[in-house]
Amino acid sequence: MERLADRVILVWGFKRSLLAIGAGAFAVLALPPFGFFAAMFLSFTLLVWLIDGAAASPESGLIGRLWPAFAVGWLFGFGYFVAGLWWLGHALLVDSEEFAWALPLAILGLPACLAIFYGLAVALARIFWSDGMGRIAALAAGFGLMEWLRSVILTGFPWNAIGYGLMPVPLMMQSAHVIGAMGVTALAVFVFSAPALFGTRQGARTGVALAVLLFAAHLGYGAYALYLAPRPAPLPEDKRPVVRLVQPDIDQAAKMDNDADRNAIFETHLKLSAEAPRNGGRKPNIIVWPETSIPFILTDNQDALTRIADTLDDDQILIAGAVRAEEMGPGTPVRYYNSIYVIDGRGQIIAASDKVHLVPFGEYLPLEELLTELGIQNVVEVPGGFSAAASRHLLALPGGLNLYPLICYEIIFPDEMTGDIKDANALLNLTNDAWFGMTPGPYQHFLQARVRAVETGLPLIRDANSGISALVNAHGEIIAGLDLGETGFIDATVDSLSEGFGSTYPRQTYFWLTEALLILIALISREGFIFGLN
């Protein structure tokens, strides 16, 4: 293995760049729909050796000394994000005449920007680089910090954080309840990088042993949480809500077509909602439709509310995604919100919640005046774009069920599970992944949603237009669901309700403690204070 390490360390020029990009791209096999987490062992082993060879002239300034390492990290990240996010281009092809020109920006431009975070992670690690296991601790700390920054800088976009590669199944998700997805990311990089120590021998015994212990603890805690830890007491049989998830699989082009029969789309949802339970099951208490499932402004269409009332029984509730319009007075443009409505059996809207975290260039246009003059517009055609709600609040349903609402990609942000979530007993995620067709995107989105359930300790009710719709318990296990591309409905019983984790602060604290510990290991190793590390 030392010979292989030497060859990688010494590779130069175009071959070096190609190897870095390839290592990043190969790591994507650890993500859904593949879930081959072992791929990241090879990718990060190669990355460590490439960083070992990222030398600069001693006479160079700080930036000059760190530039080769930054370049390696950027190339690795570029390969990772191109291979992991290429499917974003599918959304632009829904209206190809209008947006096909932006394909290079989505497929290459966004990955190039996101790769900067990985370049900075490697450059930061290079500052603490040593010959022993300290270098993989430094790399883990660098990636943990930069993945966290990626989730908060500008509007944030933490999609496909490295840690998800170490969480393909519920057994391997449970650590996120303690240290969060970003904490798992830091530990994952340490574990995935450990085989690189065999290539240089120094610190191999200590470093690999620690990595094995961390991986064993990761699995051990997962087994404890799934099979040994106490679970919430099940609700009495007659108190268990039955939730119907409606998945109409409406083609996105049809949803955007102004000439489409919107009533037909609406009736498709009503028909699936009205069908009798299968196998003699209980009728649903709660019926859920996906994001923007109501194809018109509901408050302007009393006939639609009447049709909903005709479909529902008096004791049933409909939760549906819709566009909400808010009149702001004479001479002021109408504001539009991506919203969730709760409608009772009489056709009355009894609760609503608006989306807080909007998708840039999809739901609103940054620097709108400038970009509009250049002919650039939102992918979603709403006059003036969507407005963001100032805050998120619970949807309190009759019977004491409090849902924490998250629309579309809001569920990928770990640090946004705040505020009223302490009073929630389930997460609600409405989305429309039909934008991305039969690509890896919806599978990646679903994994991140399941990890949010684990982090918060709350069951997840997720409804998607084209899939994946599912009821997920607080351990990330799928209770019932509909796969990508299926049309129909599924009735699922919520057996128990969780009180959750209270807030994100314990996880954030443990994440920063993990970062501090990794940096301490890197510093100690660099100074040679512990035998066998250098």
UniProtKB/Swiss-Prot annotation:
One of its GO terms (biological process) is lipoprotein biosynthetic process. The keyword Chaperone does not apply. Keywords: Acyltransferase, Cell inner membrane, Cell membrane, Membrane, Transferase, Transmembrane, Transmembrane helix. Pathway: Protein modification; lipoprotein biosynthesis (N-acyl transfer). Its EC number is 2.3.1.269. Pfam families: CN_hydrolase, LNT_N. The chain crosses the membrane at residues 8-28, 31-51, 69-89, 105-125, 127-147, 178-198, 208-228, 511-531. It is found in: Cell inner membrane. GO terms for cellular component: plasma membrane. The keyword Transferase applies. Coiled coil: none annotated. It is a multi-pass membrane protein. The active site is at 291 (proton acceptor), 355, 408 (nucleophile). Residues 246-496 form the CN hydrolase domain. One of its GO terms (molecular function) is N-acyltransferase activity. Belongs to the CN hydrolase family. Apolipoprotein N-acyltransferase subfamily. Catalyzes the phospholipid dependent N-acylation of the N-terminal cysteine of apolipoprotein, the last step in lipoprotein maturation. This is Apolipoprotein N-acyltransferase.
